[in-house]
Amino acid sequence: MNPNQKIITIGSTSLGLVVLNILLHIVSITVTVLVLPGNGNNGSCNETVIREYNETVRVERVTQWHNTNIVEYIERPESGHFMNNTEALCDAKGFAPFSKDNGIRIGSRGHVFVIREPFVSCSPTECRTFFLTQGSLLNDKHSNGTVKDRSPYRTLMSVEIGQSPNVYQARFEAVAWSATACHDGKKWMTIGVTGPDAKAVAVVHYGGVPTDVINSWAGDILRTQESSCTCIQGECFWVMTDGPANRQAQYRVFKAKQGKIIGQAEISFNGGHIEECSCYPNEGKVECVCRDNWTGTNRPVLVISPDLSYRVGYLCAGLPSDTPRGEDSQFTGSCTSPMGNQGYGVKGFGFRQGNDVWMGRTISRTSRSGFEVLKVRNGWVQNSKEQIKRQVVVDNLNWSGYSGSFTLPVELTKRNCLVPCFWVEMIRGKPEEKTIWTSSSSVVMCGVDHEIADWSWHDGAILPFDIDEM
């Protein structure tokens, strides 16, 4: 066979293979259309697959048609009912670790936000950690100067509890340098305070969209709880302050339903000071333990009824729980008046257990270091010093910070009572350490039916970071 014949033979063979390939494709398509199951059947040609992603909670409908995927995002249907939250608190013999985010340790080499004021709140299906970012990342030049409380860069964001406040899993909630958030059983409600000190605005978000606003009424740094608000049978309550941090200010409690404000009440508290309340539901009412930044080393107590009537006073216990504070032995306690004559303070919490009270406080009397919870017999109703339980959460060799309360709803636990939980913020960086930044991580503890051994679940990050040495 000469070269020309070889070329003709190879070409003819190739052409024949191409034609055969085309015929096979035609047969394949014909079989797919005519033979495989059609509408109403579970064939692989035309099917719908529902996928749920828990991190950024979205639902996808994926329609597969001839190897082509059509993705349609579906709005997540809301729950069918509001949470009740009228149950009593469960009795807690101790507090077990629920989560720890280790955000600063991870942030030395990860994309983690610079934050402060973390807090936890729960829906019927999950708990989330909320936090106020500084619009910057750890170990980055924009972290410089983040000791400042209020800036236009601060935002409220959230992650599933236990996750670090990282850029990949965080969900935007609101523009805010002060905030609160809670779930009514159907949707999340968040309140973010932002704007200039004299004309700040609180924007209410429900289901992720703005639904109402509260303008500053006293013109002096409108601010709110920095912890979970409280929803009872679809109505959500939170406390706000407007006015000086070191003398008489103005205080209001607000009530909203599905993101719309339906009531508010002025809290009359002459001679007392209320800031950064830590609130929780208990037997159909909202109980709050707050911060007196003016004079008291005992904590204000505010009990709110669904009709916005209230009782206000101070935590009766004969042990102080604010910082700075004096010696326990020199403190007498009062149910009605500030005691201790110490200015400044730190956000804290307490839980009523019948007439007893669990109260959290720093171990140090003068600085935000260490953290312990004490149970005081009759401490909710009397000036009792009888400490019946004590548990260390952070030892006094390590920094702590704010702390606050929340509860696990019965829909989540399947119990007939609300589990009391608290979180402890562990502040690192300025002003106590030689860095250019200030941020924090947190540990979360929940009430259990057993005593828990003392330990230190401290932050553990090794400072300074690379950015601090440039």
Predicted regions and their residues:
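C-terminal structured domain segments
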Residues: S405-E411
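Alpha-helical transmembrane segments in eukaryotic/viral proteins
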Residues: I8-G40
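Short, low-complexity, Lys/Arg-enriched N-terminal segments of secretory-pathway carbohydrate enzymes
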Residues: M1-P3
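Beta-rich carbohydrate-recognition and catalytic domains
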Residues: G43-F113, E117-E276, Y280-V346, G350-G401, ...
